[in-house]
Each structure stands twice: as structure tokens, then as C-alpha cells.
Amino acid sequence: QEPATLTTATGIIHGTFDLPSGTEPFPVALIIAGSGPTDRDGNSAMLAGKNNSLKLLAQSLATANIASLRFDKRGIGASAAAGPKEADLRFENYVDDAAAWVEQLRHDKRFSTVTIIGHSEGALIGAIATARTHPNAFISVAGVGRPAGFVLREQLNGKLPAQLFQANEKILR
């Protein structure tokens, strides 16, 4: 493992490279976490315990001679200082971050090709970043197969107070 950083206008985003033991250049995968306060290892501050799903994925890729980069989203973990105030955070920030990581990986001579792997919301972020940066490949892991507004309504129904749910509905229209 090796630390990685991405400098943004709001601060530094921190990540981890998992590198194979072999001869460079390696293919590299950018792993993008799903929604919520999810760290580079795939753990959410909203859930008890740790599953380390993204860390395990990165380790498995390394055994297959594929390097990977996973990172704490802005506002989370070691990237907490890079997060704007909650009111100023936009989905596009995450897309911009993913696109910047792809460009950084593309110019790193240790890597031969760049693939984006996005989980859940990370798949949507990855798809948009793919359209912008044209990596060699894109993999969606449990990405939404229905319109995002429909999925958000399902996820938030019964979890928000009625007034807040109605305000959310206006945004989703």
C-alpha cells in the first residue's frame, strides 16, 4: 500500500494505492465508494462495524496484478478537511474529484490503462466521469438501473419527516 493525494480547491483528498508485486506498468482501477459517509475501505459511519468491502476488492485486484486507488470522499475520513459545508456540497464535486483522479492516474507512468469501478452511487459518479475523461473501461457494481429520482424516493420514504420529504420531492421533480 502507498498513500495518494489529490489537491482540490477546497483541500486535499486522501487515498490509498494497492500495488501488485510485479513489473510495471500495471493496469489501474479507480474505486469509487457509494453514497453516504463511506470511507476508502467501504465502511460507512452510519453503520455499525466494518466490512472493508472496497479494501478487500483492492487487495483481490492486486493479487490479479491490477493496481487500484481508493479514496476517502471529501468530508470523510482523512479527506474531512476537503469537504465544503454540507449546504455547499454538490454531486458534481464528486464527479470532478473522480475525473481529476482519472487524469492523475493517466499521467502516472506506473500504469498502462485506467478503469473506473463505481459502487452504488459511485457507479453514477463513475459513469459521468467516464463520459468526461474516457478511461479504458468502466465497471458498475450495484449501480442503479432505474431513474435516480425514483430510487431516492424509495430510500427516503418513511425516513424523513413529512415536511422534509415534501421539500425533497420538489427537488426531485
Stretch-by-stretch model annotation:
Residues T115, A137-I139:
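Residue in the alpha/beta-hydrolase core beta-strand immediately N-terminal to the catalytic nucleophile
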Residues G22-L61:
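Short, surface-exposed "cap/lid" segments of acyl-processing enzymes
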Residues Q1-E24, V28:
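N-terminal cap/lid segment of alpha/beta-hydrolase-fold proteins
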Residues N52-A80:
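Conserved alpha/beta-hydrolase
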Residues S53, E86-H107:
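Alpha/beta-hydrolase active-site loop
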Residues A123-T133:
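Short glycine-enriched nucleophile-adjacent loop
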